[in-house]
Amino acid sequence: MAIQRPADARPVAAHAFRGFNGLVGHEVVAWRPGFVEMSLKVRPELCNANGLLHGGVLMTLLDSASGFACTFNDTATARRLSVTLAFTTQFIKAARDGDVLGILGAWRPSTSQSTFAAETEIYDQKGDLVATGAGTFRYLKGERSDGMLSFLDQKAAD
């Protein structure tokens, strides 16, 4: 897939997700229509009995990035609602406690007004590919506030 960060992706101020995503602890780093970049520092409580990042956490990161990539709102205070219809994941390399993961999500063109597709990739701090995902999603009516999500001034982010 090799998703690239677009030059116009806007930096996002640190904030806390609500619900399950808040428990996982990933953050939005940059966002624009059709693209999101997230990050996660792997913690012991996210690892399985083998000391590796649990596959369910990887799937959550892939799913979350897919949804964000396709539900952009330029105010950053609310985004469209969506649900996952189908998702395929490929685990490529293990991640461990202390690893810092970069998660990239990208929207893929669709002929439908109610559904969309997205692809996602997770990389470790060395730039090695950890996992990939591809899914189909359905837009719901309305928007939801993500609380304090806000864009940073580009100069402040540099």
Model-identified regions with their sequence ranges:
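Terminal targeting signals and extreme-terminal segments of soluble enzymes
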Residues: 1-103, 107-158
